[in-house]
Amino acid sequence: MTGKATSEASVSTPEETAPEPAKVPTTEPSGEVAASESTGQEQAPEPQKPQAQDPAAPAASAMPAATKPEPPSEDVPSAPLRLTLEDVSHSSLTVSWEPPEKLGKLGLQGYVLEFCREGASEWVPVNPRPVMVTQQTVRNLALGDKFFLRVTAVSSAGAGPPAVLDQPVHIQEITEAPKIRVPRHLRQTYIRQVGESVNLQIPFQGKPKPQVSWTHNGHALDNQRVNVRSGDQDSILFIRSAQRADSGRYELTVHLEGLEAKASIDILVIEKPGPPSSIKLLDVWGCNAALEWTPPQDTGNTELLGYTVQKADKRTGQWFTVLERYHPTTCTISDLIIGNSYSFRVFSENLCGLSDLATTTKELAHIHKADITAKPREFIERDFSEAPSFTQPLADHTSTPGYSTQLFCSVRASPKPKIIWMKNKMDIQGDPKYRAVSEQGVCTLEIRKPSPFDSGVYTCKAINVLGEASVDCRLEVKASATH
């Protein structure tokens, strides 16, 4: 019971008809209670003497009579609360309780757990002295015994009234239905290679010990090849050197008193496949060769992952892989070198790897040089001619008298256009006050030390054989203020 102090004890089971004195528990140095013989002079609190049984009362199943309780005293504690049977097995039982409602004026010294066999009248303490725990496990009980249990709270003034279980506790074999717990890695096909060992450990549950049996594909196991060892909680199947004949479904059956549980495990023993049965060079054209082959007769007891195709030049004899894990049985090998002769071979592949041998073409693939005639195309010269168009127009500008200023624009044309600058529609070329520059399509007009007289509308015109274009802007030269 979680959160409670616990104690364990072992109880001897003397025969009631024997003349020996009754056995009572004693405390070992370890703190646990072991069985030992008592002469009735133990220092533990004396059990209450039962009253004589009524002859008319049942002899076997009646609860043993207890002494008539004395009126409760304020010095002794009251009876413990909620005495509960927690667990029973074939050789032990566990009980728990809660502290009494009243501990008495002198305080609590501990609890005394007592048992009385069904049909007997003597209450025997489990511990030689009171223990400060609220849960105890009594061990070493005989199968088939029935006990009444009670617990008493004890103080220095004496023992209080007991708390008693209403029904006797029957010590009996616990039956647990069989159940097999297959490990996760065995829930899918278990694959091993030929020659490897197979060692399967399958846990199971069931009480008492169940009967275990194995079958292979519905038949009994071959004891010369397969070894089985079963314990109380698991069964081990072992094959020292697995062969392909060991593949199949192994079924584990656990029987217990008319109940059974079954689990199946699929084992697949594989090996490398054989090579393809045949290979044929179908055709050779240009720098290409077409191949075809047939699947192997032996796949290694498992599915093929594909084929590996290799080529080798006759001059070097070195093999190079062209295709890996290729599933079809026909392929075309491209990018072969002109003038070389090639051989081809194909391997089969499964989970164990490539086949030890490969199937090779008998004939060579000769890559011949073909006659090539060059037919040059007629050169068509592109016409880049274009009428003038301004890609960047002139922008209006404001200048200060006495400081040179510049106007910019850019033009696109082919052939190169003629650039003409004008002021107020009048050509200003040749005027030393202006300097015009045109380079890489960028047109610049510099006005040296302008005055208010130079204000006006400036125009840049571009002319070639395909047309002309022009852009305008306004220049304003502000006179300086006079004082």
Curated annotation (Swiss-Prot):
SMART domains according to UniProt: FN3, IG, IGc2
Region (Disordered): 1-78
Compositionally biased intervals (Polar residues): 1-15
Listed InterPro entries: FN3_dom, FN3_sf, Ig-like_dom, Ig-like_dom_sf, Ig-like_fold, Ig_I-set, Ig_sub, Ig_sub2
Organ and tissue specificity: Skeletal muscle. Expressed at low levels in heart ventricles.
Biological process, per Gene Ontology: cell adhesion
Keyword Metal-binding (UniProt): no
Protein name: Myosin-binding protein H
Organism, scientific name: Mus musculus (Mouse)
